[in-house]
Structure formats: structure tokens, C-alpha cells
Amino acid sequence: MKAISRVLIAMVAAIAALFTSTGTSHAGLDNELSLVDGQDRTLTVQQWDTFLNGVFPLDRNRLTREWFHSGRAKYIVAGPGADEFEGTLELGYQIGFPWSLGVGINFSYTTPNILIDDGDITAPPFGLNSVITPNLFPGVSISADLGNGPGIQEVATFSVDVSGAEGGVAVSNAHGTVTGAAGGVLLRPFARLIASTGDSVTTYGEPWNMN
């Protein structure tokens, strides 16, 4: 599905490397996709434990959709030079709407609880095995003029620099809203791995209906 536009928000540029993240209370692997890149490495990106909890909007506006997002994204690199892999891991949505009444769509995303596990952010062996949950970025907002008609908006809600043969990032109860869209709103979560060489692979989950 072709997106009308794509917005990338870099949130954790200071993190040099991420390693495998811990689980959540939801069910396991949701989807994955692999790609053999130009250096004969197999790049795999996965989504785990995805859960979007749609709630009644606090503004009580029938054109507002509000939800809380929990889940994980993981990547695995196999093949020659896998340990030297460097790139970016993204999480985001494709947002589908049937009608916008000419007022556009506003997307806001706050991240009260991003978890990063086993991140070697200084020098080994410091054993950072505990979960780190700082308020790395309190909120971002994206607006797009969609006109009178259906459409799709793709938004990368956050992006982290990664290195090494495997790693991941998890988010718990991150908050999102879409306003100004009449009718139901569909959210299709995705995870994308982009190598420093430019190769990329994206896995898309099932759509979630935010009625």
C-alpha cells in the first residue's frame, strides 16, 4: 500500500547499541519479514506482542480516536559481518481513514514508557540487564491536510540506532490520538530495519480498527 507521506521522527540518537528486549504479557510473534541485502546478510525484522487498546476519547469528540500501544520490535542479522551491522530500527503506523471532512488529520504520540534492555551504552562489561524507562521524548505531533476524501498516512513514531547481530526495542502504553477523521480509523503497525548501507526490510501487522 502506497503511503501519501512518510514522517520519520528520530527519538533516541544517543543510544549506540541495543540488544534483545524482554517480553510483555501479550502473545508472542505477530509477523516478520526477511531480506538478503547487498552484502549477503539476511536481515530479519519482527513485531512481537502488539496490542492497541482503543479507548473512548477524553475530548468526547466523535472525530477523535485515542489508543494506547504496547509491543516490541526485534531484528536479527545473519551472515558475513553480522556482528558489525549498523542501522536503524523504526516503529510506526499506516493510518487509513474513509473521510476527513476537509479538516485534516492530527497525530500525536507520547512515550511515557519506552523500554530498552541490555543496551551497551558505554563500554562493556557493565551488564545493563535492567530495564531502562526514561522519558526520552515527552511528545511529538504530526499534522497533515488530507482534504475531502479517503487516504493513508504513514508515520514512523520513533526510531533508534542499532548495532550488532540482534536487538530490539519495546514500548508499553504509549499514547496516540488521531483527530479530524470521520468514520472508522484503521491502524496498521509496522517495524522497519534500515541498514547503514541503505538496505531496508519492513514487516506490517494486521490492521486495528479504532471505531
From Swiss-Prot:
* Main location group: membrane
Q: Which SUPFAM superfamilies match?
A: Leukocidin-like
GO MF, one example:
porin activity
Q: Give the matching Pfam families.
A: MspA
Q: Which UniProt keywords apply?
A: Cell outer membrane, Cell wall, Ion transport, Iron, Iron transport, Membrane, Porin, Secreted, Signal, Transmembrane, Transmembrane beta strand, Transport
Superkingdom, natural source: Bacteria
What residue stretch is flagged as signal peptide?
Answer: 1-27
The induction text for this entry reads: Constitutively expressed.
One GO BP annotation here? iron ion transport
Record flagged with keyword Transport: yes
Recorded GO CC terms: cell outer membrane; extracellular region; pore complex
Where is it located?
Cell outer membrane; Secreted, Cell wall
**Keyword field contains Iron:** yes
Q: What is the effect of changing residue 96 to R?
A: Increases yield of ordered crystals
Q: Which InterPro entries match?
A: Leukocidin/porin_MspA_sf, Porin_fam_mycobact-type
> What's this chain's function?
The major porin in this organism, forms a water-filled channel which favors the permeation of cations, amino acids, iron Fe(3+) and less efficiently phosphate. Does not transport Fe-ExoMS, the predominant siderophore. Plays a role in transport of beta-lactamase and hydrophilic fluoroquinolone antibiotics such as norfloxacin as well as chloramphenicol. There are about 2400 porins in wild-type, 800 in an mspA deletion and 150 in a double mspA-mspC deletion.
Q: Which family does it belong to?
A: Belongs to the mycobacterial porin (TC 1.B.24) family.
Query: Assembly state and interactors?
Result: Forms very stable octamers. Isolated as a 100 kDa complex that can be reduced to monomers upon boiling in 80% dimethyl sulfoxide for 15 minutes. Structures show a goblet with the wide end on the exterior of the outer membrane and a central channel. It is not known if mixed oligomers of MspA with other Msp subunits form in vivo.
Supply the domain comment. The rim domain (28-96 and 152-211) is accessible from the external milieu and is partially embedded in the outer membrane. The stem domain (131-148) is inaccessible from the outside and embedded in the outer membrane, while loop 6 (121-127) is thought to be in the periplasm.
The identity of this protein, by name, is Porin MspA
What lineage does the source organism belong to? Bacteria, Bacillati, Actinomycetota, Actinomycetes, Mycobacteriales
